[in-house]
Amino acid sequence: MDFWFSEMQTPNVKLSIRVDHQLYSGKSEFQRIDVFESPEFGRFLTLDGYMMLTEKDEFIYHEMITHVPMAVHPKVRDVLVIGAGDGGVIRELTRYPEIEHIDMAEIDPLVVEVCRKYLPQTACRLDDPRLSIYYEDGVRFVRSKENCYDLIIVDSTDPFGPGEGLFTREFYGSCFKALREDGIMVNQHESPFYAADAAACQRAHKRI
C-alpha cells in the first residue's frame, strides 16, 4: 500500500509527497514533530502537519535568508537567530569567519534534538563554538537586549501557533532596540499566494 504525506494548502488544493517510511513521530510541549523519508525529496520535517523543509531543496531558503543580509551589511560580528531549530541558518552563518558570536533562541528543544539525529544535513553546525543556544521564547529573549546585534534573522513558523508572537508590533520594536545603528533584520514570512494566506499576512501586518 502506498504511503503519502499530504498537506492541505486550501480547501481546494492539496500537495502530497510519496513516503518510504516514517523516521520519527513525537509531541513536545509546543507541537507535533514528524520526520519522513521520501524517494523524491529525501528526508523532510513537518511541525503540526505542516511541511518545514526537505533535504532536497532546503538550501534555497536557508541560503537566501542568510547570504542576502550578509552581502549587504559591511561587517557582521554578532548575530541573533530566532527559531531555526533545524540548524540550516546556523550552517550558513558559520561559513563566515568574520562572525564572532551567534545567539540562537529556539522555543522547542525537541526540534533541535530531532534534527540533530535525523537531519544532520541542516543540523551539522549546531556545535560550532561561536554558537550559544537558548531554549526560550524569542519574544521574551530579545526583549532584554539593546544595541547587541548586527543582524537578526527570524526563521520562525508562520503567523500562527508558537510563532504567532513573532508577528507583533512589540516584537519588532524589541528587535529594533536590539540592533546596532546599522543593523539588519530579516524575517521569514508566509507567501500570500492563496487567499487565506494573504488574509493571515494582512492580519499580521496590522499588528505590526
Q: What is each PLM-predicted segment?
A:
Residues 1-44:
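N-terminal auxiliary segments of SAM/dcSAM-dependent transferases
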Residues 48-49:
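Short strand-turn-strand beta-turns centered on an Asx-Gly dipeptide
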Residues 2, 53-187, 194-205:
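The AdoMet/dcAdoMet-binding core of the Class I SAM-like
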